[in-house]
């Protein structure tokens, strides 16, 4: 091997690193050994030549990907700097532009709410809304939600078969399993294609079911050796490109990466989703696989994947599939806004802002976020999901259980107190341009509009709103959300369903979304400059300008009730479609106060579970998320959402200009008094 490396290095002339050369030679040797083992010595030369051609082809693709991503990152950096300039022009605070890109802000400059957070929710709920609607239409929703045992394994095999270049079919699978597998494959493929458009390079994984999920608690409990012994014979190392002599090292690094949440490159440097989502691979073979723990685990058969998932994963194909969709949506949003290296992009924009405004002490203080409610580090940790690393530790599990018991003990009557949502709905409808009487009429009727069944329910699902119960994410309305999967979380989901808070919230969100989509549909015949000022302002904050509106209004269609709606799925332009999805989802969360990444960044400050500070802050803010959200999304929007730089400036504009704030305070006070009578 050393002689080969020396010869190759001489010919290489420094174009590849020693690690990359070593990897290529290892691959060629593995091909040679495989031919010898199969008694095909006469084919060794041609096989090695073919393998070399494949590596060369992959190297060329890698160079093209790297070039594409460099160009995309330059454009995204320019857009971010333009966003900070717009923020500076309107508010005098350029740092709000970077905050807007991460978690969104209330100031109404263009792009202020088109954030990583809103896009993540928009993309994910566009997938999940369509998925749920398709499952309901095929009468498979109940089976999807309750998959287990032999039926679940059949669906896994169907999904794995569809992920082949030439599907062979699964003869022993039932008709329901085949139909369900096809629906899941439709959205899995859509998510993969969208990721590739955003900057990734993900090829078809032969026989793949879904991305492997891992229960770190179980893995830590059994230890490295037992985990390796169990998974060793279930993985297809040839498809992953792992040479036989490197299997042990790969499994060691995979175990460390999974239980710690920190992946490492061959040199031992940490690689996380923050700083590397879609690596522009510089080594030829690295395009097809990475030897480090960032490689995707590929199982030999769907049954091998299923057995592993039952023992060390989510133990649920449904949960693993939805987790895969959510991860894809998050990565798509991160790359769309921050490029292929989010951490580096945030750092670079900050440095440029510090250099640009180094002579302005007030702006520089805001850029460095001294004593600020939201730091860029905390915001980035929220949108990447890294703030949840450590949720598998014993400390995190125990305290999560305690908080869950407290939640069920103290929020039994939360449904009654949720009547105050009506006031927030009316206030947000005021911001959207409705009159005071119309806004309150909309607020009282929203829940009834959202309770409709049949075609209207299917139609509402495809808008991607009011799906929290289906997706198992509900307690975050009232808690500083800590996503710890397990039986306790399932009990909480059942609890909120039984105390009626879940159906109340979902119905209100569906109703509000139908109203907003109807507003947009009615105005779709008008040019952008002819739209009402309030509607034009809202569209602008989601990145929909005059050109975008011309594309968006092509999606206006009649709904099942005969009314005109702007349907995101009918919009031909992909990015405008996602912006409209983000608008609908975010406006529903503003109307029925639901915390987003911005509110969680304020509460959790970037501290992870399983640490002293992380657990303390989660207890401190356990029942504070609703109040904080009401201030940031309710009052805050009316205070800063019309362009005022300070509270004083907005309040000095008079009663009419502050009707939203007055309506929120008076409405919640009256409804709160009403609730206290029960």
Language model features: what each stretch is:
Residues 149, 207, 268, 561-562, ...:
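Intrinsic-disorder/low-complexity loop/linker signature
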Residues 2-190, 204, 216:
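Low-complexity, small/polar and acidic-rich linker and loop segments
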Residues 6-66, 70, 236, 243-310:
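Short, compositionally biased small/polar motifs
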Residues 141, 145-256, 424-427, 457-464, ...:
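Structured, mid-chain assembly/scaffold modules that mediate subunit interfaces
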Residues 185, 194-198, 210, 220-257, ...:
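N-terminal extramembrane/targeting module of integral membrane proteins
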Residues 194-212, 268-277, 340, 344-349, ...:
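Short glycine-rich, low-complexity/disordered patches
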Residues 296-416, 420-677:
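Hydrophobic, often aromatic-rich secondary-structure segments at membrane interfaces
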Residues 168-173, 187, 195, 202, ...:
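Short linear interaction motifs
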